[in-house]
Amino acid sequence: MLANDFGTTLIRLLLATLLGLALGFERECHGHDAGLRTHGLVSLSSAMLTLSALELAEAHQDSDPIRVVQGLAQAIGFIAGGLIFVRGGDVRNMTTAASLWMAAAVGITAGAGQYVLVLAGSLIALVLLSLLLLIEKRMGRREKKADDPESGSVTMPNRRGSTVPKRNG
């Protein structure tokens, strides 16, 4: 009876949104286009669809909420796949695509009321996104310069003022 419990519904939606915003904040801080709003909306919409599926399953016994989860996973996979591209032999935006997928998982688990799972998973995801970036930098993995003459690329400013590779030719 989630529809009759406005407080529970609101908590689940807010939790999904806030945790999605936390994931998006990390991406936004590093200049990625899929940032705060995108991650917040993906988490919120996933929670809403999950809550709706649970309501339908409760009202109609022949309804299967797992199909909504499967549909969300496919839809987010399609959107995330659109973010990924290859330039100069390097694959770009894999982490942003994965964090969008995580934002959907946050919304699904928050919408389902799995509070321990959503909080633990979000905490681990934030550690992966922030702490491991520091480790990658120390290992030199993130030290490639876009204006390196050997890479054959140059940079130009993007809408946030940071630089992005510009195609040659």
Regions found by a protein language model. Give the residues of each.
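Short, amphipathic, aromatic/basic-enriched membrane-interface segments that mark the entry/exit
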Residues: D33-L36, P65-I66, F85-T95
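Interfacial segments of multi-pass membrane proteins
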Residues: A97-A98, M102-Q114
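Alpha-helical transmembrane-segment detector that highlights a single hydrophobic TM helix
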Residues: H60-I84
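Alpha-helical transmembrane segments and their membrane-interface boundaries
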Residues: M1-V68, A112-A120, L131-R138, S153-G169
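Hydrophobic alpha-helical membrane segments
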Residues: Q74-F78, T95-L100
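Alpha-helical transmembrane segments and their membrane-interface exit regions
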Residues: I76, A125-L134
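Hydrophobic alpha-helical membrane segments of integral membrane proteins
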Residues: N93-A98, V116-G121
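Short, Lys/Arg-enriched, Gly/Pro-containing loop segments at transmembrane-helix junctions
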Residues: M139-D148
